[in-house]
């Protein structure tokens, strides 16, 4: 199997990593000469794929499938209009993506489908989340605690040309789930838990997520951290499945999407949906359940129906990012990986099972995604923390304590 990946940042890194785990050859096309995914791909073509149709066709038809890993509307539309005509499976649903790329359009869809969601301002009261309709991840997100902060955040976004979404702030654990769908059938995959840095960017993904057997769910830290084995109450994961499936079918999705929710009580409230390959969570799913989402997506497109899957957790996994800079070592959101150089896959990196990193001995500034697995989430977290300490000692870096923030309701997988 040979996969053409268009885009070499966060989503491209995810695609290249999981394609390699499936034993596939990868060809990366990116306009830049040193994107993060370039270090993981078998071949890197530096090009704007839309600039030369003959060359693009040659690249696409030399591969068994094309997976867009970017969010440039022009590029996506160009590929969607051509790749299927060239007879190559196109692992992307442009119509569904266009709906989910707008948070305002998504909220209208949630209302039509009667999907639980945060209340719109002012019904939800304060604090409230103010965010741009079309930005990705944590970009532009503000938690406003009074009307002065709210109006300032709204004014700043409007001045930058954004349509603005203002909705209820929902405290509680943040969960994510991917769904494969095709031809009116949909299959939910493994649920993951998300934790955030001070800028509301996802710094850590944990799998699996469990329900409390009895009594109240585990308390949630200000950064979204909790005992993920008992993160939510009974019935919440089933309700999340139901909401995710309703959205996939409502979108008439032929492909992959991820759904992010906050759980502030007995039901999950859907924050946003993205009809494309996300970053971060698929690797955590792979390490916990063994499900390779890129491989499953290609199989879904090939046979025209999502395959049956066993999403039972085989082990726990923790996936987190660190940055070394100025003599400090910090656990931070995934933005530090988007600005990294070409990444290498390093097994056993300072005690982690694997790392994706642009680290080199003696280099003063670098970033890494650390991946650890264990029998339980508590043991996986312990190992992840031990890895960070090992890095700090070996590299003579000062570890920065993780800053707890208001439990964000944005900034999950990109």
Give, region by region, the residue ranges found by the protein language model.
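ATP-binding N-terminal substructure of ATP-dependent carboxylate-amine bond-forming enzymes
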Residues: 1-93, 363, 375-376, 382-403, ...
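Hydrophobic anchor at the start of a short beta-strand
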Residues: 26-29, 117, 128, 164
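Active-site regions of enzymes building and remodeling cell-envelope glycoconjugates
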Residues: 39-48, 129-130, 340-347
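A conserved helix-loop-beta module that forms one wall/lid of the active-site cleft
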Residues: 84-148, 152
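Glycine-rich phosphate/pyrophosphate-binding beta-alpha loops
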Residues: 135-138, 274-289
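Short beta-strand-to-turn element immediately C-terminal to the catalytic PLP-Schiff-base lysine
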Residues: 141-146, 180-182, 207-208, 372
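Phosphate-binding core of ATP-grasp and ATP-grasp-like enzymes
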Residues: 157-163, 170-229, 238-268, 274-282, ...
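Peripheral (often C-terminal) accessory segments that flank ATP-dependent C-N-forming ligase machineries
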Residues: 298-414
């Amino acid at each position: 199997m040979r996969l053409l990946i268009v885009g070499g940042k966060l989503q491209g890194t995810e695609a290249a990593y999981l394609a390699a785990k499936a034993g596939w050859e990868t060809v990366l096309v990116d306009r830049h000469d040193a994107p993060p995914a370039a270090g993981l791909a078998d071949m890197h073509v530096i090009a704007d794929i839309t600039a030369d149709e003959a060359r693009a066709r040659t690249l696409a038809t030399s591969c068994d499938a094309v997976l867009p890993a970017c969010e440039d509307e022009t590029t996506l539309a160009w590929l969607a209009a051509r790749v299927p005509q060239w007879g190559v499976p196109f692992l992307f649903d442009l119509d569904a993506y266009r709906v989910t790329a707008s948070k305002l359009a998504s909220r209208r869809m949630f209302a039509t489908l009667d999907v639980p969601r945060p209340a719109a301002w002012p019904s939800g009261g304060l604090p409230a989340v103010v965010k741009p309709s079309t930005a990705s991840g944590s970009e532009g997100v503000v938690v406003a605690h009074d009307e002065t902060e709210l109006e300032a955040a709204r004014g700043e976004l409007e001045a930058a040309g954004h349509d603005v979404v203002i909705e209820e702030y929902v405290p509680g654990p943040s969960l994510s789930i991917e769904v494969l769908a095709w031809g009116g059938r949909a299959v939910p995959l493994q649920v993951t838990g998300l934790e955030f840095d001070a800028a509301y960017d996802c710094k850590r993904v944990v799998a699996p997520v469990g329900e409390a057997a009895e009594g109240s769910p585990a308390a949630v830290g200000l950064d979204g951290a909790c005992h993920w084995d008992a993160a939510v109450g009974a019935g919440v994961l089933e309700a999340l499945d139901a909401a995710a499936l309703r959205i996939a079918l409502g979108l008439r999705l032929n492909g992959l999407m991820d759904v992010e929710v906050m759980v502030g009580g007995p039901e999950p409230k859907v924050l946003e949906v993205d009809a494309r390959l996300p970053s971060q969570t698929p690797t955590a799913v792979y390490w916990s359940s063994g499900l390779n989402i890129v491989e499953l997506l290609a199989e879904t497109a090939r046979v025209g129906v999502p395959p049956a899957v066993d999403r039972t957790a085989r082990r726990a996994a923790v996936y987190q990012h660190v940055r070394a800079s100025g003599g400090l070592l910090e656990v931070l959101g995934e933005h530090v990986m988007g600005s990294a150089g070409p990444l290498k896959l390093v097994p056993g990196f300072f005690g982690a099972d694997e790392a994706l990193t642009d680290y080199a001995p003696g280099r003063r500034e670098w970033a890494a995604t650390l991946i650890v697995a264990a029998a339980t989430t508590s043991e996986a977290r312990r190992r992840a923390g031990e890895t960070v300490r090992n890095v700090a000692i070996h590299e003579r870096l000062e570890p920065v304590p993780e800053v707890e923030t208001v439990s964000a309701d944005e900034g999950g997988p990109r």
